[in-house]
């Protein structure tokens, strides 16, 4: 260990490597708005719930291995309880008997919470166009990111996670409490995603991704 003393009326001595103490201090202190720090921390610490429904879960579990290393994106903390998680990946076929269980688990997630629909079966029912399969998890849950494929590769899930992180990093944190003439009140902050869910469910035509419209 190396140390040195510098008088207050003297110029700080340069550290090994040519850096002064001011330069080293500038590299280790971050100045930002509180909202920016909250969004930065939130998007880089998404905790997924360890939950799977069908074969897509195999690809999801593979994304946590060292070969794909989902820990690079801050999502390596897999929680066994939905009360300790804020991300739920619907990976697999959602049967009608399983839908109430999925909804119950979603309600127990921590706020703010997000949903990734992984695979064709979760997105639209896949090839199971029958009475016993829900034709898309967005019929009863608000979905943030859709990952296509049957099944999607782990890289596709990581791409969906990066898209979710980008969206979370742009979310403005609403005011939680407002002081008014009636005292402290909680301001209503409805989710725009939830408000648009009914409109999106009624959509029958999608824009061509290669068009200029």
UniProtKB/Swiss-Prot annotation:
Q: How does it assemble?
A: NDH-1 is composed of 14 different subunits. Subunits NuoB, C, D, E, F, and G constitute the peripheral sector of the complex.
* Record region (Disordered): 183-213
Subcellular localization(s) per the UniProt record: Cell inner membrane
Q: What EC identifiers does the entry list?
A: 7.1.1.-
Q: Name one Pfam family in it.
A: Oxidored_q6
| Iron-sulfur found in the keyword field | yes
Record key words, sorted: 4Fe-4S, Cell inner membrane, Cell membrane, Iron, Iron-sulfur, Membrane, Metal-binding, NAD, Quinone, Translocase, Transport, Ubiquinone
Specify residue ranges for compositional bias: Basic and acidic residues. 191-213
Instruction: List the GO cellular component terms.
Output: plasma membrane; respiratory chain complex I
Per its UniProt entry, what is the enzyme's top EC class, as one word? translocase
**InterPro entries from the entry?**
NADH_UbQ_OxRdtase-like_20kDa, NADH_UQ_OxRdtase_20Kd_su
Main localization, broad class: membrane
Requisite cofactors? [4Fe-4S] cluster
Q: Which NCBIfam families match?
A: nuoB_fam, PRK06411.1
List S-S links within the chain: none
Q: List, in alphabetical order, the Gene Ontology terms for molecular function in this entry.
A: 4 iron, 4 sulfur cluster binding; iron ion binding; NADH dehydrogenase (ubiquinone) activity; NADH:ubiquinone reductase (non-electrogenic) activity; quinone binding
Its membrane topology is listed as: Peripheral membrane protein
Q: Which family does the entry's similarity section mention?
A: Belongs to the complex I 20 kDa subunit family.
Q: What does the record give as the function of this protein?
A: NDH-1 shuttles electrons from NADH, via FMN and iron-sulfur (Fe-S) centers, to quinones in the respiratory chain. The immediate electron acceptor for the enzyme in this species is believed to be ubiquinone. Couples the redox reaction to proton translocation (for every two electrons transferred, four hydrogen ions are translocated across the cytoplasmic membrane), and thus conserves the redox energy in a proton gradient.
- Describe how the cofactor binds: Binds 1 [4Fe-4S] cluster.
Q: What is this protein called?
A: NADH-quinone oxidoreductase subunit B
Q: Catalysed reaction per UniProt?
A: a quinone + NADH + 5 H(+)(in) = a quinol + NAD(+) + 4 H(+)(out)
Alphabetically, which GO biological process terms does the record hold? aerobic respiration; electron transport coupled proton transport
